[in-house]
Amino acid sequence: MSSGTKRALADIIRRPLITEKGTRLLEENKYLFEVTPGANKIQIAQAIEELFSVKVTKVNTFNPPARQRRVGKYLGTRSSYKRAIVTLQEGDSITLFPEV
């Protein structure tokens, strides 16, 4: 795979999300990521497989709505984002944080 294609796949995955739900999902071999809003499930699975050398069995995506926020007297919106819950094959795992 060329370095340009690998870089494009790396741009799909923005960051892992560490939330209460995300830590519960780790026990089920599922990982929570923030991804670019235009990415589809196939692209997300390919990116995870290439970046972490694991086998993805399932991808669930979720687009929470953009929220309105008030800053002083001005009303604005928080940027929207897309989440992906990635299920890995039995026996595979991703090390999100190195052991200390």
Curated annotation (Swiss-Prot):
Source taxon at top rank: Bacteria
An individual GO BP term: translation
GO CC terms in record: cytosolic large ribosomal subunit
Gene3D superfamilies tied to this protein: 3.30.70.330
The keyword Ubl conjugation appears for this protein: no
Keywords: Ribonucleoprotein, Ribosomal protein, RNA-binding, rRNA-binding
GO molecular function: rRNA binding; structural constituent of ribosome
HAMAP family tied to this protein: Ribosomal_uL23_B (MF_01369_B)
Subunit composition and interactions: Part of the 50S ribosomal subunit. Contacts protein L29, and trigger factor when it is bound to the ribosome.
PANTHER family, sorted: 60S RIBOSOMAL PROTEIN L23A
Free-text function comment from the UniProt entry: One of the early assembly proteins it binds 23S rRNA. One of the proteins that surrounds the polypeptide exit tunnel on the outside of the ribosome. Forms the main docking site for trigger factor binding to the ribosome.
Family: Belongs to the universal ribosomal protein uL23 family.
Protein name per Swiss-Prot or TrEMBL: Large ribosomal subunit protein uL23
